[in-house]
Regions:
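N-terminal, positively charged/glycine-rich alpha-helical extensions of SAM-dependent methyltransferases
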Residues: 1-28
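Short amphipathic alpha-helix with an adjacent loop that forms part of the alpha/beta core around
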Residues: 49, 138-145
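Conserved class I S-adenosyl-L-methionine
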Residues: 56-64
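Class I SAM-dependent methyltransferase SAM/SAH-binding core
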Residues: 67-138
Protein backbone atom coordinates (compact mmCIF):
# COMPACT_ATOMS: atom_id res chain seq x y z
CA UNK A 1 0.00 0.00 0.00
CA UNK A 2 1.46 3.35 -1.05
CA UNK A 3 1.60 6.20 1.47
CA UNK A 4 1.20 9.41 -0.56
CA UNK A 5 2.49 11.53 2.35
CA UNK A 6 6.08 10.43 1.76
CA UNK A 7 6.30 12.14 -1.62
CA UNK A 8 7.81 15.60 -2.02
CA UNK A 9 5.65 18.65 -2.60
CA UNK A 10 6.52 20.07 -6.05
CA UNK A 11 8.85 23.06 -5.82
CA UNK A 12 8.17 26.26 -7.72
CA UNK A 13 11.26 27.17 -9.76
CA UNK A 14 10.81 30.17 -12.05
CA UNK A 15 14.32 30.94 -13.24
CA UNK A 16 16.28 28.60 -15.50
CA UNK A 17 19.45 30.28 -14.19
CA UNK A 18 18.82 28.55 -10.84
CA UNK A 19 19.06 25.14 -12.54
CA UNK A 20 21.79 22.67 -13.46
CA UNK A 21 20.59 20.55 -16.38
CA UNK A 22 22.30 17.17 -16.35
CA UNK A 23 20.49 16.15 -19.54
CA UNK A 24 19.69 18.12 -22.66
CA UNK A 25 15.95 18.75 -22.45
CA UNK A 26 13.26 19.91 -24.86
CA UNK A 27 10.73 21.68 -22.65
CA UNK A 28 7.32 22.96 -23.71
CA UNK A 29 7.41 26.76 -23.71
CA UNK A 30 11.19 26.87 -23.34
CA UNK A 31 12.60 24.97 -26.32
CA UNK A 32 15.90 23.09 -26.14
CA UNK A 33 17.97 23.54 -22.99
CA UNK A 34 21.49 22.21 -23.41
CA UNK A 35 22.53 19.81 -20.67
CA UNK A 36 25.95 19.87 -19.04
CA UNK A 37 26.49 16.13 -19.27
CA UNK A 38 24.27 13.77 -21.29
CA UNK A 39 22.22 14.14 -24.46
CA UNK A 40 20.04 11.03 -24.73
CA UNK A 41 17.63 12.40 -27.32
CA UNK A 42 16.77 10.04 -30.14
CA UNK A 43 18.15 6.97 -28.38
CA UNK A 44 15.88 6.72 -25.36
CA UNK A 45 14.28 3.39 -26.22
CA UNK A 46 17.67 1.67 -26.47
CA UNK A 47 18.73 3.26 -23.18
CA UNK A 48 15.59 1.86 -21.53
CA UNK A 49 15.92 -1.61 -23.04
CA UNK A 50 13.05 -1.22 -25.54
CA UNK A 51 10.59 -1.99 -22.75
CA UNK A 52 6.88 -1.17 -23.10
CA UNK A 53 6.02 1.33 -20.35
CA UNK A 54 2.31 1.73 -21.11
CA UNK A 55 0.30 1.32 -17.91
CA UNK A 56 3.38 0.43 -15.85
CA UNK A 57 4.23 1.75 -12.39
CA UNK A 58 7.94 2.60 -12.47
CA UNK A 59 10.52 3.18 -9.72
CA UNK A 60 13.39 5.33 -10.98
CA UNK A 61 16.64 5.62 -9.02
CA UNK A 62 18.35 9.00 -9.46
CA UNK A 63 16.28 11.14 -11.86
CA UNK A 64 18.78 14.03 -12.14
CA UNK A 65 17.00 16.60 -14.34
CA UNK A 66 14.17 14.17 -15.06
CA UNK A 67 14.80 13.49 -18.74
CA UNK A 68 14.09 9.76 -18.42
CA UNK A 69 11.28 10.41 -15.95
CA UNK A 70 9.31 12.42 -18.46
CA UNK A 71 10.23 10.17 -21.40
CA UNK A 72 8.83 7.16 -19.51
CA UNK A 73 5.78 9.20 -18.58
CA UNK A 74 5.24 10.07 -22.26
CA UNK A 75 5.29 6.34 -22.94
CA UNK A 76 2.45 5.76 -20.48
CA UNK A 77 4.27 5.08 -17.20
CA UNK A 78 3.34 6.23 -13.70
CA UNK A 79 6.78 7.21 -12.36
CA UNK A 80 8.11 7.52 -8.82
CA UNK A 81 11.71 8.78 -8.61
CA UNK A 82 14.10 8.42 -5.67
CA UNK A 83 16.60 11.23 -5.09
CA UNK A 84 19.12 11.87 -2.32
CA UNK A 85 18.38 14.38 0.41
CA UNK A 86 20.45 17.49 1.00
CA UNK A 87 21.90 15.70 4.05
CA UNK A 88 23.23 12.78 1.99
CA UNK A 89 24.19 14.92 -1.00
CA UNK A 90 26.29 12.28 -2.73
CA UNK A 91 27.93 8.92 -2.06
CA UNK A 92 31.41 10.44 -1.91
CA UNK A 93 34.51 8.29 -2.35
CA UNK A 94 36.41 8.79 0.96
CA UNK A 95 39.46 10.73 -0.16
CA UNK A 96 41.30 12.60 2.66
CA UNK A 97 38.97 15.18 4.20
CA UNK A 98 41.06 18.20 3.21
CA UNK A 99 41.06 17.09 -0.42
CA UNK A 100 37.42 16.04 -0.47
CA UNK A 101 36.34 19.41 0.88
CA UNK A 102 37.23 20.84 -2.55
CA UNK A 103 34.36 18.82 -4.02
CA UNK A 104 31.75 18.73 -1.24
CA UNK A 105 30.86 22.43 -1.16
CA UNK A 106 30.43 22.87 -4.93
CA UNK A 107 28.59 19.55 -5.17
CA UNK A 108 25.98 20.63 -2.63
CA UNK A 109 25.26 23.70 -4.76
CA UNK A 110 25.05 21.62 -7.95
CA UNK A 111 22.71 19.09 -6.32
CA UNK A 112 20.32 21.86 -5.30
CA UNK A 113 20.44 23.28 -8.82
CA UNK A 114 19.92 19.77 -10.21
CA UNK A 115 16.78 19.35 -8.13
CA UNK A 116 15.64 22.76 -9.35
CA UNK A 117 16.07 21.61 -12.96
CA UNK A 118 13.88 18.59 -12.24
CA UNK A 119 11.05 20.70 -10.82
CA UNK A 120 11.42 23.33 -13.56
CA UNK A 121 11.02 20.55 -16.14
CA UNK A 122 8.24 18.88 -14.13
CA UNK A 123 6.18 22.07 -14.32
CA UNK A 124 6.92 22.60 -18.03
CA UNK A 125 5.72 19.07 -18.83
CA UNK A 126 2.75 19.36 -16.42
CA UNK A 127 4.01 16.06 -15.09
CA UNK A 128 2.27 13.83 -12.56
CA UNK A 129 5.53 12.06 -11.61
CA UNK A 130 6.35 11.86 -7.91
CA UNK A 131 9.63 12.19 -6.02
CA UNK A 132 10.75 10.61 -2.77
CA UNK A 133 13.77 12.24 -1.10
CA UNK A 134 15.53 9.73 1.10
CA UNK A 135 18.15 7.02 1.57
CA UNK A 136 18.44 4.95 -1.59
CA UNK A 137 19.98 2.11 0.43
CA UNK A 138 16.88 1.81 2.63
CA UNK A 139 13.77 2.33 0.54
CA UNK A 140 10.57 2.42 2.60
CA UNK A 141 7.80 -0.10 1.95
CA UNK A 142 5.44 2.90 1.86
CA UNK A 143 6.64 3.50 -1.72
CA UNK A 144 4.55 0.49 -2.67
CA UNK A 145 5.12 -2.11 -5.36
CA UNK A 146 6.19 -1.50 -8.96
CA UNK A 147 6.13 -3.20 -12.32
CA UNK A 148 9.58 -1.90 -13.31
CA UNK A 149 12.59 -0.37 -11.53
CA UNK A 150 15.08 1.66 -13.57
CA UNK A 151 18.72 2.21 -12.59
CA UNK A 152 20.09 4.36 -15.40
CA UNK A 153 23.81 5.13 -15.07
CA UNK A 154 23.58 5.44 -11.30
CA UNK A 155 25.12 2.27 -9.88
CA UNK A 156 28.67 3.29 -10.82
CA UNK A 157 28.23 6.26 -8.46
CA UNK A 158 27.18 4.13 -5.46
CA UNK A 159 29.38 2.47 -2.85
CA UNK A 160 27.03 -0.51 -2.56
CA UNK A 161 25.34 -1.06 -5.94
CA UNK A 162 24.15 -4.56 -5.04
CA UNK A 163 22.22 -3.19 -2.08
CA UNK A 164 20.32 -0.88 -4.44
CA UNK A 165 19.57 -3.71 -6.88
CA UNK A 166 18.39 -5.85 -3.96
CA UNK A 167 16.09 -3.06 -2.75
CA UNK A 168 14.64 -2.58 -6.23
CA UNK A 169 14.27 -6.34 -6.70
CA UNK A 170 12.02 -6.54 -3.64
CA UNK A 171 9.74 -3.85 -5.05
CA UNK A 172 9.60 -4.55 -8.79
CA UNK A 173 9.00 -7.50 -11.13
CA UNK A 174 11.36 -6.17 -13.82
CA UNK A 175 14.70 -4.38 -13.45
CA UNK A 176 16.39 -2.20 -16.07
CA UNK A 177 20.10 -1.53 -15.52
CA UNK A 178 22.06 0.78 -17.82
CA UNK A 179 25.74 1.57 -17.36
CA UNK A 180 29.00 2.30 -19.15
CA UNK A 181 30.45 -0.52 -21.25
CA UNK A 182 33.95 -1.76 -20.36
CA UNK A 183 34.86 -4.50 -22.88
CA UNK A 184 38.08 -5.36 -21.02
CA UNK A 185 36.01 -6.59 -18.07
CA UNK A 186 33.71 -8.85 -20.09
CA UNK A 187 33.87 -12.59 -19.56
CA UNK A 188 33.66 -12.64 -15.77
CA UNK A 189 31.20 -11.38 -13.12
CA UNK A 190 33.45 -8.59 -11.85
CA UNK A 191 33.58 -4.92 -10.99
CA UNK A 192 36.69 -2.73 -10.84
CA UNK A 193 37.39 0.11 -8.44
CA UNK A 194 37.51 3.32 -10.50
CA UNK A 195 39.09 5.92 -8.14
CA UNK A 196 42.85 6.08 -7.59
CA UNK A 197 44.92 8.45 -5.44
CA UNK A 198 45.86 10.29 -8.63
CA UNK A 199 42.57 10.68 -10.53
CA UNK A 200 40.48 12.18 -7.66
CA UNK A 201 37.39 10.42 -8.99
CA UNK A 202 35.31 11.33 -5.94
CA UNK A 203 31.99 10.80 -7.72
CA UNK A 204 32.48 7.36 -9.32
CA UNK A 205 33.16 4.07 -7.57
CA UNK A 206 32.97 1.26 -10.11
CA UNK A 207 33.36 -0.12 -13.62
CA UNK A 208 31.18 -3.19 -14.24
CA UNK A 209 31.04 -6.19 -16.52
CA UNK A 210 27.58 -7.18 -17.73
CA UNK A 211 28.03 -10.60 -16.08
CA UNK A 212 28.44 -8.88 -12.71
CA UNK A 213 24.80 -7.85 -12.97
CA UNK A 214 23.34 -10.87 -14.77
CA UNK A 215 24.81 -13.27 -12.20
CA UNK A 216 23.51 -11.24 -9.26
CA UNK A 217 20.09 -10.91 -10.89
CA UNK A 218 20.04 -14.69 -11.35
CA UNK A 219 20.90 -15.12 -7.66
CA UNK A 220 17.80 -13.03 -6.85
CA UNK A 221 15.60 -15.07 -9.19
CA UNK A 222 15.62 -12.74 -12.20
CA UNK A 223 16.18 -13.89 -15.79
CA UNK A 224 18.03 -11.59 -18.21
CA UNK A 225 16.65 -12.02 -21.72
CA UNK A 226 19.09 -9.85 -23.67
CA UNK A 227 21.79 -7.21 -23.34
CA UNK A 228 21.67 -4.16 -25.59
CA UNK A 229 24.66 -2.01 -26.45
CA UNK A 230 24.09 1.52 -27.68
CA UNK A 231 25.88 4.81 -28.21
CA UNK A 232 25.01 7.91 -26.18
CA UNK A 233 26.59 11.35 -26.10
CA UNK A 234 28.32 12.66 -22.98
CA UNK A 235 29.73 16.18 -23.14
CA UNK A 236 29.79 16.00 -26.92
CA UNK A 237 31.57 12.66 -27.19
CA UNK A 238 30.04 9.25 -28.05
CA UNK A 239 30.22 6.51 -25.43
CA UNK A 240 29.07 2.90 -25.55
CA UNK A 241 26.64 1.85 -22.83
CA UNK A 242 24.87 -1.42 -22.11
CA UNK A 243 21.32 -2.00 -20.97
CA UNK A 244 20.03 -5.24 -19.53
CA UNK A 245 16.52 -6.14 -18.49
CA UNK A 246 15.92 -8.73 -15.79
CA UNK A 247 12.49 -10.23 -15.13
CA UNK A 248 11.41 -12.22 -12.11
CA UNK A 249 9.75 -15.50 -12.97
Amino acid sequence: MTDEKIFATPRKVDNVADCYFYHTMELPGHGVIEGRDWDLRGRVDDYLGNVDFAGQRVLEIGPASGFLTFEMEKRGADVVSVEVTAEHGWDFVPYPAAKLEEAIGPRRIVMQQLKNSYWFSHAAHQSKAKVYYGDVYNLPTALGQFDIAVMGSVLLHCRDPLRIIEQCGKMARSLIITDMSHPDLEGAPVCRLAPTPQNFLWHTWWHFSTQFFTQFLAVMGFTTSEILRHQQRHRGRPYTLFTLVGRRE
